[in-house]
Amino acid sequence: MNLKLALVLLLTVINVGMLPGATSNGNIKTDIKCYRNSHCNFHCEKSYYCQGSKCVRKRCNCYNCPL
């Protein structure tokens, strides 16, 4: 039962995170690990890009990147 609850919470967090503009301060998101810039730019929509472990608004949305 606890495992089921954890899964539901995880899916909820993922779904909320994929909403447009779901960033900590509107510019940089730090609670997700981004992949390399080339992978991010290839796989993601053009609104965020990876900068280290941060998602920075500009080129692609790192939520769609392979981790």
UniProtKB/Swiss-Prot annotation:
Family annotation (InterPro entries): Scorpion_toxin-like_sf
Cystine connections: 34-55, 40-60, 44-62, 50-65
Protein name: Potassium channel toxin alpha-KTx 6.16
Protein source organism: Opisthacanthus cayaporum (South American scorpion)
Location(s) in or outside the cell: Secreted
Signal peptide location: 1-24
MF annotations from Gene Ontology: potassium channel regulator activity; toxin activity
Keywords: Disulfide bond, Ion channel impairing toxin, Neurotoxin, Potassium channel impairing toxin, Secreted, Signal, Toxin
